[in-house]
């Protein structure tokens, strides 16, 4: 369907967010005539979301910007079960304490994108543990479980993937689909919520909730999914050679976050500007026309705009300036990520492989060795060819720092502590 009446669907369509909608005309009509409450679920499986989940946060952002009410549902209850959708194996179960700690950490990110409060379209953050932990199992089976067909649940692609590979799917995980469907109904009852959004891998789970709502007498519920994004080269969003691109500042610096977006492939620039920034579409179209070396200016704008939304404009501009000094002027900027190494350790000397791991440029000595042997590692801009090299205080420059580099884009300053 094209020519949406509602600002929300029109915005999402123009920017490339929409993969599938359960009832386009019905949802469009509803959004055009009243304030709609909608939610997306987030699993607290780590202390931070990563950039792969940013598209979902942006959907909630545009929902609020077009006059509707966003709800971020934290899976404090379902997080203890684990979503089996398109996973190759069962996920490690998490304790209540770990989930609570992760939720508290994740909450900080949402305040950068959404306005929370008591207004008509102010955002809410809700924990499904509030109702799931108090369920009476026998009553739940009688009132909710009877509405689910096991035959139909087995037909979902997310389940078939595991079964076709002859991999175990526990009863615990199988129940996740029922619990997520129940969330939709419970949120409708508590907050009048009518729309659930998510990635395209969640389609089956969301439709389950719509069907359950129909059987339990809720008003018409709706589903909207976004595409599962990969880069032009097929890499998953939110991952890099150095690991996950975390959204929390205490897990990834604003500079490293900026660099991730600066390194966007040429073919992805226009798409990412539409999805991850709030720049006007005509400005994005202008930037998309840039070619050759000029495309790098569009990448810098992308990096700065995405970083500004998450970390603030000052941090984004500082990251951009640090990159300019480092890569264009050849200066050693003190705004680069810094790692302290005990003076005694530097005096005695530390192996370059261990230093790479300590600086979080690599996760293992083996990975660091491969980078050294591949010629990707430099100390103070001098190539390192021997993985047995020992780095000591003699490498400190006039500023009392050691510049450790992996490739052309990743740099860390080593400072005696």
Swiss-Prot record:
Motif 'KMSKS' region per record, residues: 236-240
GO biological process: one example: tyrosyl-tRNA aminoacylation
GO molecular function: ATP binding; RNA binding; tyrosine-tRNA ligase activity
Enzyme Commission number(s) of this protein: 6.1.1.1
Keywords: Aminoacyl-tRNA synthetase, ATP-binding, Cytoplasm, Ligase, Nucleotide-binding, Protein biosynthesis, RNA-binding
Residue sites binding ATP per the record: 239
Motif position, 'HIGH' region: 44-53
GO cellular component terms, semicolon-separated: cytosol
Domain of life: Bacteria
InterPro entries for the chain: aa-tRNA-synth_I_CS, aa-tRNA-synth_Ic, Rossmann-like_a/b/a_fold, S4_RNA-bd_sf, SYY-like_C, Tyr-tRNA-ligase, Tyr-tRNA-ligase_bac-type, Tyr-tRNA-ligase_bac_1
One Pfam entry name: tRNA-synt_1b
Reactions catalysed: tRNA(Tyr) + L-tyrosine + ATP = L-tyrosyl-tRNA(Tyr) + AMP + diphosphate + H(+)
EC category name: ligase
Annotated S4 RNA-binding domain residues: 350-417
Protein localization: Cytoplasm
UniProt keyword annotation of Protein biosynthesis present: yes
Binding-site positions, L-tyrosine: 39, 176, 180
Similarity comment: family membership: Belongs to the class-I aminoacyl-tRNA synthetase family. TyrS type 1 subfamily.
Subunit structure: Homodimer.
Alphabetical list of HAMAP family matching this protein: Tyr_tRNA_synth_type1
Function: Catalyzes the attachment of tyrosine to tRNA(Tyr) in a two-step reaction: tyrosine is first activated by ATP to form Tyr-AMP and then transferred to the acceptor end of tRNA(Tyr).
Protein name: Tyrosine--tRNA ligase
Natural source organism: Brucella abortus (strain 2308)
Gene that encodes it: tyrS
């Amino acid at each position: 369907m094209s020519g949406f009446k509602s600002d929300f669907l029109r915005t999402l369509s123009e920017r490339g967010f929409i993969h599938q909608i359960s009832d386009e005309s019905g949802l469009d009509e509803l959004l055009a005539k009243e304030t709609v409450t909608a939610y997306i679920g987030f699993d607290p499986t780590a202390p931070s979301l990563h950039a792969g989940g940013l598209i979902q946060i942006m959907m909630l952002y545009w929902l609020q910007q077009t006059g509707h009410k966003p709800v971020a549902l934290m899976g404090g209850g379902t997080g203890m079960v684990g979503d089996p959708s398109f996973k190759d194996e069962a996920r490690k179960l998490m304790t209540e304490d770990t989930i609570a700690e992760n939720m508290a950490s994740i909450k900080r990110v949402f305040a950068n994108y959404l306005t929370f409060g008591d207004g008509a379209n102010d955002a809410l953050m809700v924990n499904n543990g509030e109702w799931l932990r108090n369920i009476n199992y026998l009553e739940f089976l009688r009132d909710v479980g009877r509405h689910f067909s096991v035959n139909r649940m087995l037909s979902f692609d997310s389940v078939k993937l595991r079964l076709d590979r002859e991999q175990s799917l526990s009863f615990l995980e199988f129940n996740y689909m029922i619990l997520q469907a129940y969330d939709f109904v419970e949120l409708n009852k508590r907050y009048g919520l009518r729309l659930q959004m998510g990635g395209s891998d969640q389609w089956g789970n969301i439709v389950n909730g719509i069907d359950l709502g129909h059987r339990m007498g809720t008003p018409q519920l709706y589903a909207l999914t976004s595409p599962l994004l990969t880069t032009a080269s097929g890499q998953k969003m939110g991952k890099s050679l150095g690991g996950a691109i975390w959204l929390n500042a205490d897990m990834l610096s604003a500079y490293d976050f900026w660099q991730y977006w600066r390194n966007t492939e040429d073919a992805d620039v226009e798409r990412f500007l539409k999805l991850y920034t709030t720049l006007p579409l005509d400005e994005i179209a202008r930037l998309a026309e840039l070619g050759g070396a000029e495309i790098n200016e569009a990448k810098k704008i992308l990096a700065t705009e995405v970083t500004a939304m998450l970390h603030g404009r000052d941090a984004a501009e500082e990251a951009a300036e640090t990159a300019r000094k480092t890569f264009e002027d050849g200066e050693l900027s003190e705004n680069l990520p810094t790692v302290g190494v005990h003076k005694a350790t530097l005096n005695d000397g530390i192996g370059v492989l261990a230093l790479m791991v300590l600086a979080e440029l690599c996760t293992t000595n083996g990975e660091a060795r491969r980078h050294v042997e591949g010629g990707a590692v430099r100390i103070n801009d001098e190539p390192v060819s021997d993985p047995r090299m020992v780095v000591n205080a003699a490498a400190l420059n006039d500023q009392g720092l050691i510049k450790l580099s992996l490739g052309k884009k990743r740099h860390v300053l080593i400072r005696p502590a």
